[in-house]
């Protein structure tokens, strides 16, 4: 939430147990918000993510980032849950990043939808990685070495939107030069 507050974008917090978060009104459910939602960032225990994704579908959210872990990276049971979430997002035609990711940063749009410790300097390099830990480390180093980025994507488990789609987007949109990516083995 702290990263979003810096972006000066309109944000809504959703938490069924708190009426305020960082001094802002918190809604019990995304359905209670009387506005269109461009992006939902889900950071809750894995066992309730599917219900929240279904709420996002009913709300006609345009995109979803799931930072929560506890899915395919944990074994067969987690993979089954991840597949159910993917099916829901696919059927609703809602792009889904994650789960198990750090999030995204678009410095050209002034958006930090991640759990990175701080927003890096704006530059020309796009950074993509499955590993949120690697991105976190590179953001730390970039601050020390005065390096900048245009966009940063941690795509996690790639249950729906994957590395090849991000590479194609960056290539077609000519949004960055060069593109750096770490591929898992």
Model-derived segments and spans:
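Catalytic-core regions of core metabolic enzymes
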Residues: 1-185
């Amino acid at each position: 939430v702290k990263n979003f507050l810096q972006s000066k974008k309109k944000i809504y917090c959703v938490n069924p147990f708190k009426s305020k978060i960082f001094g802002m009104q918190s809604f019990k459910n995304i359905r209670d918000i009387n506005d269109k939602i461009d992006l939902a960032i889900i950071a809750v225990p894995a066992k309730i993510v599917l219900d929240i994704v279904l709420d996002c579908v009913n709300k006609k959210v345009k995109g979803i980032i799931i930072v929560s872990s506890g899915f395919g990276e944990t074994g067969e049971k987690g993979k089954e849950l991840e597949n159910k979430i993917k099916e829901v997002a696919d059927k609703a035609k809602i792009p889904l990043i994650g789960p198990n990711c750090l999030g995204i940063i678009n410095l050209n749009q002034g958006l930090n939808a991640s759990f990175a410790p701080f927003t890096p300097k704006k530059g020309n390099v796009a950074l993509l990685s499955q590993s949120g830990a690697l991105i976190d480390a590179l953001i730390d180093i970039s601050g020390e070495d005065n390096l900048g980025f245009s966009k940063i994507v941690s795509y996690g488990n790639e249950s729906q939107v994957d590395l090849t789609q991000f590479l194609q987007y960056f290539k077609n949109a000519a949004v960055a030069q060069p593109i750096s990516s770490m591929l898992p083995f």
